From Swiss-Prot:
Protein family according to the UniProt entry: Belongs to the prokaryotic ubiquitin-like protein family.
Biased composition (Basic and acidic residues): 1-14
Post-translation changes: Is modified by deamidation of its C-terminal glutamine to glutamate by the deamidase Dop, a prerequisite to the subsequent pupylation process.
Pathway per the UniProt entry: Protein degradation; proteasomal Pup-dependent pathway
Cross-link (Isoglutamyl lysine isopeptide (Gln-Lys) (interchain with K-? in acceptor proteins)): 65
Coiled coil region boundaries: 26-49
Biological function: Protein modifier that is covalently attached to lysine residues of substrate proteins, thereby targeting them for proteasomal degradation. The tagging system is termed pupylation.
Notes on the domains: The N-terminal unstructured half of Pup provides a signal required to initiate unfolding and degradation by the proteasome but is not needed for pupylation, while the C-terminal helical half of Pup interacts with ARC to target proteins to the proteasome.
Keyword Cytoplasm: no
Entry GO MF terms: proteasome binding; protein tag activity
UniProt name for this protein: Prokaryotic ubiquitin-like protein Pup
């Protein structure tokens, strides 16, 4: 057994990272999605500014639950 060595086959295909091609329509959808996420984050910020104490209480665990 001491004379046998294991060799791993080289996988150059997996080592190369390819940049995905994004069509213009997908880019527009990504921008729309970003705008939706930004709007949601703005809404969360407003809730936290106006009622942060109650918001935090909603996440407090009681009795090990």
């Amino acid at each position: 057994m001491s004379g046998h060595e294991q060799q791993r086959p080289s996988r150059r295909e997996e080592d190369v990272e390819e940049t995905p091609v994004v069509p213009a329509q997908a880019g527009a959808q990504a921008k729309e999605s970003d705008a939706d996420v930004d709007a949601l984050l703005d809404e969360i910020d407003e809730v936290l500014e106006s009622n942060s104490e109650e918001f935090v209480r909603g996440f407090v665990q009681k009795g090990g639950q």
